[in-house]
């Protein structure tokens, strides 16, 4: 009788353990699905914010470029215009990196290409925003 009892208890323990392992696997897979869904939502929100920010910066840069293109330009205005064009290229390269690289390298010699990529590595969002802020400040100063 003791042997039957030990076998029955062992069988119950084994089946309970198997059920708990199966439940753990199901809860882990459900957790993974939920985490993946939340990551997709976060990426979607981040992508939407980035897209809105890029669109706003592109619109602002185009407006400033049109303003500088319509009137007489000083050397300083010409430099600001060149920087705005560089900002526009950088923003386009965020959307289509392969096409932007191809477009940027057309018509340049090798030294200019090397300088372009060296400069591009040094560029970060802070200086771009500083440039746009300075351009807006100069524009408001000229208008005011």
Curated annotation (Swiss-Prot):
<dbReference type="Pfam" id="PF05298">
    <property type="entry name" value="Bombinin"/>
</dbReference>
<keyword id="KW-0354">Hemolysis</keyword>
<feature type="signal peptide">
    <location>
        <begin position="1"/>
        <end position="18"/>
    </location>
</feature>
<dbReference type="GO" id="GO:0031640">
    <property type="term" value="P:killing of cells of another organism"/>
</dbReference>
<feature type="modified residue" description="Leucine amide">
    <location>
        <position position="143"/>
    </location>
</feature>
<keyword id="KW-0964">Secreted</keyword>
<feature type="propeptide">
    <location>
        <begin position="19"/>
        <end position="43"/>
    </location>
</feature>
<dbReference type="GO" id="GO:0005576">
    <property type="term" value="C:extracellular region"/>
</dbReference>
<keyword id="KW-0165">Cleavage on pair of basic residues</keyword>
<keyword id="KW-0929">Antimicrobial</keyword>
<feature type="modified residue" description="Serine amide">
    <location>
        <position position="70"/>
    </location>
</feature>
<keyword id="KW-0878">Amphibian defense peptide</keyword>
<dbReference type="InterPro" id="IPR007962">
    <property type="entry name" value="Bombinin"/>
</dbReference>
<keyword id="KW-0204">Cytolysis</keyword>
<comment type="function">
    <text>Maximin-10 shows antimicrobial activity against bacteria and against the fungus C.albicans. It has little hemolytic activity.</text>
</comment>
<feature type="propeptide">
    <location>
        <begin position="74"/>
        <end position="123"/>
    </location>
</feature>
<keyword id="KW-0027">Amidation</keyword>
<dbReference type="GO" id="GO:0050832">
    <property type="term" value="P:defense response to fungus"/>
</dbReference>
<keyword id="KW-0044">Antibiotic</keyword>
<keyword id="KW-0732">Signal</keyword>
<protein>
    <recommendedName>
        <fullName>Maximins 10/H15</fullName>
    </recommendedName>
</protein>
<comment type="function">
    <text>Maximin-H15 shows antimicrobial activity against bacteria and against the fungus C.albicans. Shows strong hemolytic activity.</text>
</comment>
<keyword id="KW-0295">Fungicide</keyword>
<comment type="similarity">
    <text>Belongs to the bombinin family.</text>
</comment>
<dbReference type="GO" id="GO:0042742">
    <property type="term" value="P:defense response to bacterium"/>
</dbReference>
């Amino acid at each position: 009788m003791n042997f039957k009892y030990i076998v029955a208890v062992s069988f119950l323990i084994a089946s309970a353990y198997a059920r708990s392992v199966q439940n753990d696997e199901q809860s882990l897979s459900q957790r993974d699905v939920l985490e993946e869904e939340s990551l997709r939502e976060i990426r979607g929100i981040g992508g939407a914010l980035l897209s809105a920010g890029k669109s706003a910066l592109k619109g602002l840069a185009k407006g400033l470029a049109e303003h500088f293109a319509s009137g007489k330009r000083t050397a300083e205005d010409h430099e600001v215009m060149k920087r705005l064009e560089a900002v526009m290229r950088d923003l386009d390269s965020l959307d289509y990196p392969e096409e932007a690289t191809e477009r940027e390298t057309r018509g340049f010699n090798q030294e200019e290409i090397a300088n372009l990529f060296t400069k591009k590595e040094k560029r970060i969002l802070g200086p771009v925003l500083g440039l746009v802020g300075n351009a807006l400040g100069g524009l408001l100063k000229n208008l005011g």
